[in-house]
Amino acid sequence: MPIDLAIDFGTSKTVLLSGNKIILEQPTVATVDSETWEPVAFGDKARDMIGRLPEHLESVFPIQRGMIADYDVAEQMLTEYFTNSLGKHLIKPRVIIAMPSGATSIQRRSLENAAEIAGGRKVQVIDSAVAAALGMGIDFTRPGGKMVIDIGAGVTDIAMLSGGGIVQCDSAPIGSLDFDDAIIKYVRKEFNVLIGQLTAEELKKQIGSVVPRKEEVIIKAKGRNLFSGLPQLFDITSTDVYLAMKDTAQNLFSAINSVIERTPPDIVADVMCDKIYVTGGGALVNGVAELLGKNLNTDVLVRSDAEYSVVKGAQAALKQPDLIKNIDYQLRNIQDLISNLE
């Protein structure tokens, strides 16, 4: 029996969905041999090795800002994930894979090629924001503007949708990983302590917020003292983490405002009378929905399963081929226009 496979090949996480069931969810990271560049581990195993590797091995993140940064590793990772989740089938799975709207035709084709070599057939690429809209059950086939924001780990996709198509779209190179980087820089500057990416991520999840918390929270964190080089245990507050994150949040909202400013007034009016739909793992960062609603003076909807909206929408898109063909045509025209302006 033919298999349909929807993929969210994200900067920090890869999710495979088949038959409305998540069949694989793994970090988008590999451990490779430094000399041969041959992968020795993928996913959770590779993530657990970050910061703990011997000299002959290194961590590689094949997707950067939503685009393929290392084609060979990306291809081998998809092959590994396909095999682990599906086993061996006589009929290759039909594949649809999400990608930021800012991707060029060359970048889109590169991703299609990687998925085909990994074992997919009839590979399609869908815009992440469109997939997110479908995954949230938004009907944008009728007149009336809908605004969808997909905040991923490395990139944020912003789209104005109406009448079954894209009115305005953009991809901003800002995501939830930038909050982690901001926390690392803040701790280094204010505490003279170096912390790793995983520690920063935990601080973001536990006490992070892009708005001041009503009650101060203090937790202990571990790092390495920059002067002595020794391990150090230190107290960090929710206010510290807020101060670390707030500038990145402002950069994110500036990118969103830029799309709104380029959108026809009637579509903007529709959005303001309805709500803004926010999805992606970054949507779950504390205070994002609150601050966005306050800045734009409108309601914001974030679902509890926001990090899976894109892959669910990608699967739903397989049942609407005409809609996807129309949107793909629009995106290619938008990219051609941008290229001509450059």
Predicted segments, located by residue:
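Positively charged, low-complexity, intrinsically disordered RNA-binding extensions
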Residues: 156-157
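Nucleotide/phosphate-binding catalytic cleft detector across ATP-hydrolyzing
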Residues: 1-151, 160-276, 283-306, 310, ...
